[in-house]
Design a protein with these regions (language model features):
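Secretory targeting and sorting signals
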Residues: 2-38
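Domain-level detector of nuclease and nuclease-like folds
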Residues: 105, 114-233
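Short, solvent-exposed coil/turn linker segments
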Residues: 4, 65-67, 91, 138, ...
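Secreted/periplasmic proteins that engage bacterial cell-wall peptidoglycan
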Residues: 60-132, 136-137
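N-terminal module-boundary/linker segments of secreted carbohydrate-active enzymes
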Residues: 27, 38-81, 85, 212-214, ...
Length: 233
């Protein structure tokens, strides 16, 4: 029992430390309330093709031991808001609020990057899932491509990192599930270059690898936009 309590306390302390570090890093340059999702992360000077060439290529590791709680037991906090509401606040427009400080988004409009549809978000038991927060690099995909070797604080940062989070159409997100670029790309072809570049940026940041099929799929997309830059994050 003492050993279990010690492990539980260490995990909680680690989570608090990770949350504090994440909040400090993010709020040193607070993201505006209304930002077009296609440019939510400022571009670096690095071409996506060059960044892709530096990613390790390996096979997918077994999913053995995977549990989302090994990343974060629910959304972490970014300042006064949880990560879900932080992303809704960043990606939606014409927002109304349910509380103060302005954390819980009541209504808003999403220009969905995955489908190019305009979605009217209304918070509610039967309506909230119309807009979901997608991990651009899926959590289980990360687990099978390097995250098993990361510390809890690194996995926590990955799970709650705005670079890897995007408000999107709920059905499109469920269709994607835990797919990588080899098996799923946004139906909106106009967003595919940005999508792939962001996946590459996340994988580079957290030292995750790609499979050969995934690398090839990314390369095919980037042939249509050879000057695409990876986002900063």
């Amino acid at each position: 029992l003492k050993k279990s309590l010690k492990h539980f306390s260490a995990k909680k302390l680690s989570k608090k430390a990770a949350a504090s570090s994440l909040a400090l890093a993010l709020f040193s340059g607070l993201v505006p309330v209304q930002v077009d999702t296609t440019i939510a992360a400022a571009a670096t000077g690095t071409k996506a093709t060059a960044a892709l060439a530096k990613l390790a290529i390996k096979g997918r590791a077994p999913k053995t031991g995977y549990d989302r709680d090994l990343f974060s037991d629910g959304w972490g906090d970014i300042g006064e808001c949880d990560a879900r509401n932080y992303i809704l606040r960043r990606d939606l427009k014409s927002i109304t609020w349910r509380d103060s400080p302005r954390c819980t988004v009541a209504t808003g409009i999403l220009n969905d990057p995955y489908t190019a549809r305009k979605i009217y978000f209304v918070r509610g038991v039967s309506t909230s899932m119309a807009v979901q927060i997608d991990h651009i690099v899926a959590v289980s995909d990360a687990w099978q491509k390097g995250a098993q070797q990361l510390s809890y604080s690194k996995r926590y940062a990955f799970y709650n990192d705005p670079l890897n989070l995007l408000a999107v159409d709920g059905p499109a997100n469920m269709q994607k599930s835990d797919s990588d670029a080899a098996s799923w790309l946004p139906p909106n072809k106009g967003y595919r270059c940005s999508y792939v570049a962001r996946q590459i940026a996340v994988k580079a940041k957290y030292k995750l690898w790609v499979t050969k099929a995934e690398r090839d799929a990314m390369a095919r997309v980037l042939k249509t936009c050879p000057n695409q830059l990876i986002p900063r994050g």
